[in-house]
Amino acid sequence: MQPPQSVEEVKATLETTEKGGVRQSIRNCLTVFQRAPVLAGAIAYNILTDRKDIIKPIGFHRESTALTDTDMKYLLLYLEETYGLTSEKKIETAIGIVANENKYHPIRDFLNSLAWDGTERIRFCLRHFLGADVDDYTYEALKLFMLGAITRAFKPGSKFEIMLCLVGGQGAGKSTFFRLLAVRDEWFSDDLRKLDDDNVYRKLQGHWIIEMSEMMATANAKSIEEIKSFLSRQKEVYKIPYETHPADRPRQCVFGGTSNALDFLPLDRSGNRRFIPVMVYPEQAEVHILEDEAASRAYISQMWAEAMEIYRSGRYKLSFSPAMQRYLKEHQRDFMPEDTKAGMIQAYLDKYTGETVCSKQLYKEALNHTFDEPKQWEIREINEIMNQCITGWNYFSNPRMFAEYGRQKGWEREIPATDTDNPPEKSMDGFVEVTEQMELPF
């Protein structure tokens, strides 16, 4: 970009017609936007919002950075009066070109400007503001969410399917936490109401952290599948009204959930790996997040600085470790309705003395359908319970004979592991004590 010149210097460089007037050309319009003292460097393309911005004062009062219709009217007036340029279409074309040559991303600029002071905060943040437990799970959950947000800012469209869900009573500050975590209020939104809206991109556009509160509060088995599918998307395909063709809009945002109800997750025995619930206890919080908003925002800025250190190191994955995944699956059951059928089957197996069971047997004897024949979906449900919820039983696929149920696939009781590395010790008289479980060698 060339340095700004005076109005007279700019006028002297403009192309003219044969009659000496200013030529109404895109080149002349570009010259003004690139060199004029008021306009040079003023127009930029905001990668986050996918819009053109005015990023420096240009002589009239403005409410926001985004280029508006009112701004265009002022610009048209200024170019006409100062430079004799009157072609609205060519002025708009020049604005598009100069904006494309001057791109910026406000979130990237913010994150790159941070310097971490070396104090660990991510591990203690949810305790500090919301009274959550200080443990590895809570730390890994928030760290993963923040790294996902950073990655989406620097690499739009990156695969990240995780939703951090804050669970606790009303007034705990859950929504406020997500709003302040987004740093600027305009980078936060809680206005996403429908996932099948053709204009959903407009709801995501320009935002970094989006809270899904109402949808989580009313989630059922069907809607939770829709939310899962929505979270899995990496882009939206959308045609902005003034454009001719639809285009891919890679996602630059992440999604947080809040719920006042403890059992907000519908029963899903296979697990809801996309949803990471964290229980909050506001009475245990060290401070209320709005008690000193400036201090809270400074604390959160240092959290982002800490997360940027991890991001720059490259020593992270945008997923839980296998051990944490196993913990998550168990932990999520605390946030689901009681699984009564799994409880009935477990109670039956606790008293059962046989070594094998089949699904028809469990249907009739554990679930008390003595005289009924199971439907196929009921068999699938029992299979899911046995494979996902019940421990101590292993599935076998080669059918075996059951006295009352014929040849069936099923499950066999796990054989307890024996300590072969530590043979029984001899007694004082030199004999080995034989337990009930040991076979005599004759």
Regions found by a protein language model. Give the residues of each.
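Feature primarily recognizes SF3-like P-loop helicase cores of small DNA viruses
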Residues: 80-105, 159, 186-190, 196-223, ...
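N-terminal nucleic-acid engagement/recognition segments and initiation subdomains in replication
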Residues: 1-121, 140, 372-373, 377, ...
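Residue-level preference for alpha-helix termini and adjacent loops
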Residues: 38, 44-47, 53-54, 59, ...
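P-loop NTPase catalytic core of nucleic-acid-dependent motor ATPases
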Residues: 95-205
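Amphipathic alpha-helical segments that form well-ordered structural scaffolds
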Residues: 125, 145-149, 176-180, 226, ...
